Amino acid sequence: ILCHHYFNVYGILPMMWMFLDRLIEGKITRLGRLEFEPKAIDCEIRLPEIYLPKNSVLLNVHVPAGPRLTSADITDAYQQALHYFNGIVPIFHCSSWLLSPQLDECLDESTRIMQFKKDYLIYSLEDNADQFIERVWPDRENEASDYVNYEENTTLQKNAKQLLLSGRILQKANGICIKYYHPESDNV
């Protein structure tokens, strides 16, 4: 989809080869509107709500490009994943611009993106705006750092552009969703 979007031809973008490899090997499973991949985390996660040691296997969540993501889509996909991956700790992990703390300044909390984001506890941030810029301005014809010419067709584009023009950075965040994890019920 992205290659067709950017170049008007179907194909694979270089950055997608690593992801495609995991998809072909059957490591990533699409369930409803989301994609899931059991994956060991490469760091320990210490949050007030939970501690996860390094190499804990979680369900990595990928949000593929496509139609708008609704709350019902998210709940349905999570429920399917809980059944499909029965036996894996029901904690979802996501590394995405969709969890960026800067979204709090760009969007109203009632938006679909914020509804997705609110389920996640953020444990680390990456100062890499590439994914954020690529997804928010997919039609840009200018250099990634030429913020002045970025479109302002949506509330998100308008507000994120103002952050960039003020010298702020848009971050990618890593987070976990523990709302389906109930250790007292022995749900693993």
Task: Give residue spans per PLM region.
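Conserved acetyl-CoA-binding loop-helix of GNAT-fold acetyltransferases
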Residues: 68-84, 92
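Conserved beta-strand-loop-alpha-helix junction that forms the acyl-donor binding cleft
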Residues: 92-103
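Non-catalytic substrate-recognition and accessory regions of acyl/acetyltransferase enzymes
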Residues: 1-69, 87-91, 105-188
